[in-house]
Amino acid sequence: MKEDEPAGPKVEDLIAQAKMVLDFNWTGEYTRPGPRLYPHQWSWDSALIALGYARYAPDRAMRELSHLFDAQWKNGLLPQIVFNPDFAAYFPDASFWHADESPDAPTHLRTSGIVQPPVHATAVLALLRNAAEAPGVRSFCEKAFSRLVSWHDYLYRERDPGGENLVYIRHPWESGMDNSPMWDAILESMFLYPSDIPSYKRADTHFVSSEDRPESAAYDRFAYLVKLFAERNYDEARIREDCPFLVQDVLFNSLLCRAERDLAELARTLGEEPSAFEARARKTAEAINDKLWDGERGTYLGFDLVSGAHIKVLAAPNFVALYGEVPDRKRARAMLARLSSPSFSLTEGTGVPVTSYDRLGFGFSSVRYWRGPVWVNIDWFLMHGLRRYGYEDEADRLREAIVRLCREEGFYEYFDPTTGMGHGSDLFSWTAALLLDVVLEG
């Protein structure tokens, strides 16, 4: 632990508080992302939460991931949400998704019909590294390995029909960054008749301020896409024929690149052959560099497969390519320069780093979901990415930001980059878990 922690509760007290958040949200099978706004199990939330558990509670990490893997579809799809039938007051609920229309969906659990970013191999590898001697860990990792292979195979088989080694997402919710300005132009181009929009009633604005959440027009399009998937029985080939949202996203592919490397490391440790995963990681990194790099902006940009154009929006998640070890040293320096500019304030300007969207961009908001607030998971990815390239001072600044936000404001979903005030769900699980990972690290 660092000796120069900011003033506030002692580190031991902060650790205890973070563990209390996770205990409060633990259901016995999985950890709720938040106590009111998010009652079900979310895919990448559970993987990030498991990173924290791997530091002190490996049994719970195994149970967390096992519950998610138990809901995996026959085709390898790892669902965004596993629904808890005890919590019905949520939109969209299981009945809205009609995921059971797919012959691949599980019959013993209700799930959504989309995915979230692939950080699961990273979580399993962290568990093996941090708790290899704990009872049941190696056996769990051996079983999880086949689940992870099936998951990654699904992505490369079903989401990369052109064989580019870049996978696409088909819904903003699949990005994990639902309300990012990166999706605005695509959503606005989707002309819908009233009859196209399924009936729904939002639950999120009952628990947090509507000023913090996506606007209704965006939600109409989110709901329309779900309807489109269900009408096509979640058949990927049929969906991509006319789905208006097909994006090769930087964060998703960068995390997949990292996850493929981590899957290769798992394979080596477990006595399996790693070469196929190493090759896919290398090819995906090459594809990100060849297709998604934008020299003018000094970072990578997502690609809209429908319009055939790059998404020219500066957002912090596009810098997660550093975590995936995608750029060479020259490009990494350019990315650091952009992160250090007033756009994101890693080292310049005032406030808390880093904003999730360009401070100078149209529609920047310090409080609205993914349109400016600081997210601990993005800071965590960037912290590790910068450290991999030797940028220790900048990585330490992000580490200090994570600790300071949790210590001074609490374990919120996201934070105002100017004031530090917490927004969204309070008692947010991945914030607590990643704080634990940071302060309990070696």
UniProtKB/Swiss-Prot annotation:
One of its GO terms (biological process) is protein N-linked glycosylation. InterPro entries: 6-hairpin_glycosidase_sf, 6hp_glycosidase-like_sf, Glycoside_hydrolase_63, MGH1-like_GH. Its EC number is 3.2.1.170. Activity is not stimulated by divalent cations and not affected in the presence of EDTA. It holds the Pfam family MGH1-like_GH. Optimum temperature is 55 degrees Celsius. Retains about 28% and 14% of maximal activity at 30 and 80 degrees Celsius, respectively. It catalyses: (2R)-2-O-(alpha-D-mannosyl)-glycerate + H2O = D-mannose + (R)-glycerate; (2R)-2-O-(alpha-D-glucopyranosyl)-glycerate + H2O = (R)-glycerate + D-glucose. Substrate binds at Y38, W42, S43, W44, D45, Y90, Q116, G176, R213, Y369, W370. The keyword Zinc does not apply. The active site is at D178 (proton donor), E413 (proton acceptor). Belongs to the glycosyl hydrolase 63 family. Homodimer in solution. This is Mannosylglycerate hydrolase. It comes from Rubrobacter radiotolerans (Arthrobacter radiotolerans). The lineage of its organism: Bacteria, Bacillati, Actinomycetota, Rubrobacteria, Rubrobacterales.
